[in-house]
Amino acid sequence: MAFTHLHVHTEYSLLDGSSKIKELLPRAKELGMDSLAITDHGVMYGVIDFYKKAKEVGIKPILGCEIYVAPGSRFDREQGRGEDRYYHLVLLAENNQGYNCLLYTSDAAD
């Protein structure tokens, strides 16, 4: 049975991702994976490199992003009562329109 990781951080997820795209995709192929997602934290910087390298090694690239969902503005500095004030949400593009929506969402968050 094929297995695909749908929540993967690369070196573009600062302070969280340690996988380098140039090493990640050949290793995934070696492990028998036929597809793999990229879901870096709040950025889409690595998707072009990821896409090209995935195609090069014969893996279907799944482009995505892990975004933060938070009430209010990112400039709010109100402290919660010990609980997190934001949530993580993984978004994956199904097609070119979805990819464009990811780019728009990522850009709008800045």
Question: Which stretches of residues belong to each language-model region?
Answer:
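Phosphodiester-processing cores and adjacent nucleic acid-binding clamps
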Residues: 1-106
